[in-house]
């Protein structure tokens, strides 16, 4: 990477949901002057605390965090905005002589920060109208299947029920004749951050599923349902808004709407979380991650400490 100005460097710790990223990052912060830059598309929203596993006030008092609680839940927050905000945070942290550590599982954010985003066509009302009409007739899963045919890479990253992203990927293909994933891969490089990415990859999927289940139940015990009730009481939110796409929120919202009982809400939330983890792992398999570490490996904290010191200290 060449540039007339110095390039800010940072380490990114990523991996699927519930794999232990936060715990490992906080262990590192006990041993190095680290500040954490959240790379989580849900933690940016105020009021989404319990269901996003947002660090507590006590933790954030002990270890400074960035890009948490920066927008209201009725606002939109994009990957492009994250890239700008995160780059500014990393440079600020570095300028103060401290160590920036990106932590999170929103992998589109990582790509935007590391590689930049391609210049894509603007939304086209006519194309979107046609896609909406097809979805009403065939259903969004059918359009997801079509996406898998024309852009299998994007389809692997997008849930069959994620209407917004399916529509955008098909719209881009209709307007350009090229897959969205191909356009993203061809985004021009510049002097963005130099990021060393470490992914925690669970070797035991059954154990990960159990951890997801335990974590969801713990969130419920902490007041997750009451948190969603408070969001509903705001009056200007719907479960279709981007903030409420975070796993668990939409399912609990449906329960509070009376669409199904609690057991079904819990089941749907767990299914959605497992599907999220699967999509994250699929993305990581196709991404140029610097290193992949077994999430269950012993001595991860010491290994991570040595790796961070080597990268930020020597440039290796």
List the model feature ranges, each with a label:
Residues 1-316:
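Phosphate/pyrophosphate-binding catalytic cores of soluble transferases and nucleic-acid-acting enzymes
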